[in-house]
């Protein structure tokens, strides 16, 4: 499988990686088999997170005896220095390893949070640097869903990799973020290649991403058949045919008016409604086990705030994609109520 240099990390990673969210839904034995199949097919980049319940532990078991053949990336949400240190040690224990190749700040979507991380006196970046000096982590990365924040993160030159949503509908990174990553020699990791499950044509999705030679893509894998299909795409013809381009344009037209990119330009909401979280709730249902979102410390509280909508329409006036936000909020909340009732 083709490998590329992951920016200034210098790591030679496969262009096709592994995303560790879906294996939470599997039995441990099946999860281990899926990860090991990825390794057998040549995939050498595995992504997970402290918050993905059983994912780290299952990856740790899957790579037993093959640790030095793979690169493991995991992440932590920002917190206090003590919390970061505890999360890192927990990840090392779960993964059954004494080092993590890339440790990432998870979901940094605004300048204020980034500024706190990079504060020269008390920033959490210092905790990561300390861990790097101790040999617990080898490279420092960051993940984001918000373009303005992502640009600042790249321009800071403090991080070696960035992970960001990218697919042929959420295609803004092609012009706005990838050129910046090239300029700063920053590794670019693609999340949401299938738009969180909204796109179902794997061939189109991955052939589109194969047009960007510096991109490492980490689809969430749940079945052996999925990784076999995607690996075959990466080994096959990479040029997009006229017929495929036509299908792509049709799907953009069909989904573009109902697809939240989580840019959060609709915010702030006077009622404190987490708009993008509620509108993208259907992707949680598709990708995650119910306990993950129903017992989350913040998702149920956020979903309930949908009832506070006053229908003012301010969010819709700010949306650069002209989404019917008020209608989509109702749909997201109704789905939440259905899932909650089914899992009582």
What are these regions, as identified by a protein language model?
Residues 1-70:
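N-terminal binding-site loop/beta-alpha segment at the start of enzyme catalytic domains
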Residues 6, 18, 38, 46, ...:
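Conserved, mostly hydrophobic/aromatic
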Residues 13, 46, 69-70, 97-100, ...:
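Local beta-strand N-terminus motif with an aromatic residue
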Residues 19, 49, 103-106, 143, ...:
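Conserved residues at the C-terminal ends of beta-strands
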Residues 29, 36, 81-189, 194:
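Glycine/proline-rich, positively charged
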Residues 39, 43-44, 176-190, 194-344:
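Structured C-terminal cap/extension of enzyme domains
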Residues 44-49, 73-74, 138-141, 161-165, ...:
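Short catalytic-loop micro-motif centered on adjacent basic/acidic residues
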Residues 69-72, 159-167, 238-244:
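Short hydrophobic/aromatic-enriched beta-strand-loop microsegments
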